[in-house]
Amino acid sequence: MRSAVRDELSRLWSVPAAIFYLAFLAYPTVQGLILIPSYAYQAPIDNFTLMTNGPVALVFPLLLTGVYVFRFSGLVNHRYACYARFRSGTSTFLGAHLIVNAITVGVLVLGSYLIAAAVAFLVLPSTGFLRGQLGYEPLPADQVADYTQQLITFSQLASAGVGVYVTVFSLFVAVFSMVIATASLGFTLLARSRILGLAATLILYTVENFALSYAGLEVFRTTTAIFPDAITPQPLWVPMIPLAAWIVLAVVLIARVRRSADQLETLA
């Protein structure tokens, strides 16, 4: 298994892939730097929320699918998966791709959030960049902590330090992203249509978003858990509900793939 994972990781590196990974890592920070001049500023967390929210929330699962599953779907579509399965064994084949998919997505998401946090909380406050933005009204130093802790879900953790908030929130989003990416890989292996398999998580994500909004349960949406600026701060158990639901879905899908492994050549 270990050698299979190493081999698959080595196949990920190419110039186009490196460009994509760098763009992925930089996206939150670049988005924030573009938006910051047009928004009011009271504390560094305002900049961090601008970096980690925004239009990407509409297509977040599709972005995660593009990290690894899109490439993998092409291999399955060309019967590579069948050959690899027979060569290395079903368990090794599935396990290697699941691990590489999760690792790649997790590292990129976590890295992008930590970079954004470093820029928002450390770099920008020490430069003159913020003074040119609309509504630059920084709070007195003795009010920043209370403001930060009351702004959005997870920011209450800043009572133990901003670093704790940033670390826990970034890890939460990274783990959630890994679970969604795992579900995407499962859909891709099970769907007979490559396009449907790739789009399945986005479709489910969108339908869930509208259904829970219609039912008045916005706090339990996946979008709200990952991009919490749209609602008032919630207890930490609230975003764990959609995460748990996605974990169950991912486990069910992968179990179904495992049971269908002997017929893998008929999938996709």
Walk through the language-model features, giving the residues of each.
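Helix-loop-helix units of permease transmembrane domains in multi-pass membrane transporters
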Residues: 70-104, 264-266
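Aromatic- and glycine-rich beta-strand/loop motifs that create alpha-glucan
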Residues: 1-22
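Hydrophobic core of alpha-helical transmembrane segments in multi-pass integral membrane proteins
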Residues: 24-32, 206, 240-256
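Alpha-helical transmembrane segments of multi-pass membrane proteins
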Residues: 22-39, 209-213
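Central hydrophobic cores of alpha-helical transmembrane segments
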Residues: 22-26, 194-208, 268
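Membrane-helix interface segments
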Residues: 16-17, 89-91, 193-198
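Secretory targeting signals
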Residues: 29-71, 75, 99-181, 185, ...
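Junction motif at the cytosolic side of a transmembrane helix
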Residues: 186, 190, 244-268
